[in-house]
Design a protein with these regions (language model features):
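Non-catalytic cap/lid and distal C-terminal segments of serine-dependent acyl enzymes
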Residues: 1-211
Length: 211
């Protein structure tokens, strides 16, 4: 990261000197070089952190589709992880997907009336397998920093790649990961409290599973 910063400042500084001292096309070329130096440094730094995976993510956009949760198993139909692994070892579970999925979900704010953005949920292969009885899986809840969003949690954190890697060596098993939104917007610093400025973020967090 520091090398990108140093290189960017060095090239931009060199170009700015030529903008001041040069004339005509040399000045134009130096101005263009300044822009490219700053842009290249910014891209290099972002590659190190993985904060913005796409151009759209700069503007809060993402490519995730709405989740279809109608086919998820009900609590009474769940089996233990040990039972699942035994069935997987016996070959009685078929069509376990190679990868999990990441989709948008709505977490109702019935009690808090907090204007949250859509959350993201990662479902591991075991939750998507062609099996009537799915395993009971742990749920990991993640929140972004500020500025931030559920999408940036998944992109910058490489959540799907990490979880899929774990699932590949554990019969499709991995935690369900939910990135909820406690901010409402990148520019809002709710401090996870109820306030007149940004709404009832604390109440939303306390009741996120029930609305």
């Amino acid at each position: 990261v520091m090398s990108w910063v140093a290189a960017g400042f060095a090239i931009a500084g060199f170009a700015i000197v030529h903008i001041v001292l040069s004339r005509g096309m040399m000045r134009v070329a130096a101005a263009i070089l300044t822009v490219f130096a700053i842009l290249a440094a910014a891209i290099g730094i972002d590659q190190s952190y993985g904060e913005y995976a796409t151009i759209g993510s700069l503007f809060g956009e993402d490519s995730y589709s709405q989740a279809d949760l109608t086919g998820l198993a009900k609590r009474k139909d769940l089996i233990t992880v040990a039972q699942w692994r035994k069935q997987a070892a016996n070959g009685t579970i078929r069509n376990i997907p190679a990868n999990g999925t990441v989709n948008k979900i709505d977490i109702p704010a019935t009690k808090s009336q907090f204007e949250a953005r859509k959350a993201l949920v990662y479902l591991p292969p075991a939750a998507l397998a062609d099996s009537k009885r799915k395993p009971a899986l742990p749920v990991v809840l993640m929140l972004s920093g500020q500025p931030g969003s559920p999408g940036r949690v998944f992109q910058a954190g490489g959540i799907q790649t990490m979880m899929d890697g774990y699932a590949k060596t554990h019969d499709g098993l991995a935690p369900i990961v939910i990135a909820a939104d406690q901010l409402g917007a990148d520019s809002h610093n709710t401090l996870c409290v109820d306030s007149k400025v940004y709404g009832n973020a604390l109440t939303y967090r306390r009741t996120w599973s029930t609305g």
